[in-house]
């Protein structure tokens, strides 16, 4: 096990725990402490399995378990508890990197450590105001901070939408706490010890947490908002490569994305298909020569993904596929009236 210890990883895991264990071991064996949170909804057998798989590593910890449903407070609570353990148990850690169980390192750990050591007081977190954000899908940029969301968007969609419309109609609004300027950004960040400690030890944290507990998708706004209060060296970008489709769902990387991932020069990527053996074998190998030192530049592959989204949503000239338009009004151009397409009748006409 190599020793550096200035970089620690917090991992939020809920599926494919065997892959999460591989990644955690990769980081831990190279001297980076790891604190793992496993979703409370994961069965005990799965949780016990990952604990046993990593039991031989002295720099791995497991935090208390929270139910982490998308869009709810549980993800923030899990991050808070795991980050607190990281700061308490590993005083040498200078940067804390938040990742998921489906993340995969793309470059040698030593390169990431060196990159952060050269920027010891810089916080890497996408953090933009609600007026400047351009990537949210479905609206609710500012309203997520001024409305209440007691219903699950995934499990109680009709109640969720109805309650949002009701609040708009009657003008119900929540008060944003004094000093809070809402910001949004990627959930996956890398913060300094000083910044993270200032957020977690804030004397007003109880009030702040009560407010954010009812913000929609708080994992994309809690740290992104509070970092602006305590840090003066924020680089508004994530060191984790992640891409999204036209619906806002994360792209999944497969084995045939190997060269694309290498071309990005990024340190970590998400989300990786758990059966992408070639990706895991390539990037978790002990060979440090697979990647040249370079500034992370996800823009190198942006055009490829933009073309994929365009093909998915607009197709190409002469191509109309029912499978590409599963919902009404998703067509590439609307006609004056309904029409039907008959296929397979060329022998008759």
Question: Which positions does each model-derived feature cover?
Answer:
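ER/Golgi luminal nucleotide-sugar-dependent glycosyltransferases, focusing on the catalytic module
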Residues: 1-349
């Amino acid at each position: 096990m190599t020793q550096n210890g200035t970089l620690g990883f917090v991992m939020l895991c809920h599926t494919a725990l065997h892959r999460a264990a591989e990644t955690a071991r990769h980081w831990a064996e190279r001297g980076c402490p790891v604190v793992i949170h496993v979703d409370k909804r994961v069965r005990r057998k799965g949780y016990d399995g990952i604990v046993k798989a990593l039991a031989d590593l002295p720099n791995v910890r497991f935090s208390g378990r929270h139910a982490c449903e998308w869009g709810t407070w549980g993800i923030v609570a899990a991050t808070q508890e795991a980050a607190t353990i990281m700061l308490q148990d590993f005083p040498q850690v200078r940067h804390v990197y938040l990742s998921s169980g489906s993340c995969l390192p793309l470059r040698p750990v030593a390169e990431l450590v060196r990159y952060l050591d050269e920027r010891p007081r810089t916080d890497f977190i996408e953090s933009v105001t609600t007026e400047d954000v351009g990537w949210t899908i479905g609206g609710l940029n500012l309203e997520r901070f001024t409305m209440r969301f007691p219903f699950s968007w995934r499990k109680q969609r009709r109640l969720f939408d109805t309650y949002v419309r009701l609040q708009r109609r009657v003008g119900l609004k929540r008060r944003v706490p004094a000093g809070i300027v809402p910001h949004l950004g990627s959930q996956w960040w890398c913060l300094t010890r000083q910044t993270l400690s200032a957020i977690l030890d804030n004397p007003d944290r109880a009030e702040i947490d009560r407010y954010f507990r009812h913000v929609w998708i708080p994992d994309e706004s809690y740290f992104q908002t509070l970092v602006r209060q305590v840090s003066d060296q924020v680089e508004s970008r994530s060191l984790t490569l992640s891409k999204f489709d036209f619906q806002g769902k994360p792209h999944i990387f497969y084995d045939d994305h190997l060269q694309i991932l290498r071309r990005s020069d990024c340190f970590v990527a998400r989300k990786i298909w758990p059966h992408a053996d070639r990706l895991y074998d390539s990037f978790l190998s002990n060979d440090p020569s697979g990647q040249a030192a370079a500034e992370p530049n996800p823009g190198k592959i942006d055009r490829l993904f933009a073309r994929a989204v365009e093909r998915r949503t607009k197709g190409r000239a002469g191509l109309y596929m029912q499978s590409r338009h599963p919902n009404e009004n998703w067509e590439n151009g609307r006609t004056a009236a309904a029409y039907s397409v008959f296929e397979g009748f060329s022998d008759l006409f």
